[in-house]
């Protein structure tokens, strides 16, 4: 039985209107690894997801080298494809662009 992934309801709603910017959490093998091996595992999982999204309505926004995530903009066909990737995807969450917190940037 394929592992089901979790999809943020906000993503469902936005994709229903067209496209949504999302973070895709990748499923990596369990266990602690040296940093180099961890980065390789992340890159392999990212490559697998991007390969399987080929031909769907997605845009790569960002690959992360040290965290198991991809930032994407997806439409209905890409979200449908992600739902079938329980072997490499844990969840799909909304990626909201937020302004800096007040007081977190230096004054000029």
Task: Map each language-model feature to its residues.
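Autoinhibitory N-terminal propeptides
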Residues: 1-108
């Amino acid at each position: 039985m394929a592992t089901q992934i979790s999809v943020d309801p906000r993503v469902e709603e936005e994709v229903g209107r067209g496209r949504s910017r999302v973070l895709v959490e990748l499923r990596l093998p369990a266990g602690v690894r040296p940093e180099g091996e961890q980065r390789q595992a992340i890159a392999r999982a990212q490559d697998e997801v991007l390969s399987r999204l080929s031909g769907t309505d997605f845009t790569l926004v960002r690959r992360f080298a040290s965290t198991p995530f991809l930032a994407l903009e997806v439409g209905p066909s890409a979200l449908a494809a992600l739902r079938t990737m329980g072997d490499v995807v844990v969840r799909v969450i909304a990626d909201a662009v937020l302004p800096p917190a007040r007081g977190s940037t230096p004054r000029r």
